[in-house]
């Protein structure tokens, strides 16, 4: 009985030491357009989901965005917090919106953000009773072909407003 208890304890300790892997299947819950330096808040938005690497040709899913919020509170990993402002778009009702797909965000039918190649990284935090805390962050991605490496917490998608593509009707 003691041997069985000892083996169970060793297996439990070894299992708790495994590093978690970043979950690319996790649903994206919000999109944050960073460096949103004006008080204007869009009236409507649309998110399109595309197969990864297909060049934004055939959307596989889409949804409307109805809830926008201008935030002046920086995220945990934001480098420059002076005059911080971002537009946060809450996302729901779309199952295919995850880090395995390319995403296009369209605001007011004129502002286009094509997001591709998101890279998730695991970050270790302070030690607690069970060991170090770990969580995933979006460490880099491409916005309209421009490399962007301002990290944000997982379940979010950071976009820089300076890479916007404007298309007039």
Regions found by a protein language model. Give the residues of each.
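Beta-strand signatures of extracellular beta-sandwich domains
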Residues: 46-48
């Amino acid at each position: 009985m003691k041997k069985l208890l000892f083996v169970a304890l060793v297996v439990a300790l070894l299992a708790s030491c495994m590093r978690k892997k970043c979950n690319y299947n996790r649903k994206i819950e919000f999109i944050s357009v960073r460096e949103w330096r004006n008080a204007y808040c869009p009236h409507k938005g649309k998110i399109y989901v595309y197969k990864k690497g297909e060049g934004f040709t055939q959307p596989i899913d889409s949804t409307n965005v109805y809830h926008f919020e201008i935030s002046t509170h920086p995220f945990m990993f934001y480098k420059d917090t002076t005059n911080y402002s971002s537009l946060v778009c809450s996302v729901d009702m779309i199952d295919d919106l995850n880090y395995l797909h390319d995403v296009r965000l369209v605001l007011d039918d004129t502002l286009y953000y094509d997001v591709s190649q998101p890279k998730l990284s695991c970050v270790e935090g302070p030690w607690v009773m069970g060991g170090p805390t770990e969580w995933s962050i979006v460490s880099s991605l491409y916005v309209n072909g421009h490399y962007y490496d301002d990290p944000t917490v997982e379940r979010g998608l950071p976009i820089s407003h300076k890479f916007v593509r404007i298309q007039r009707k």
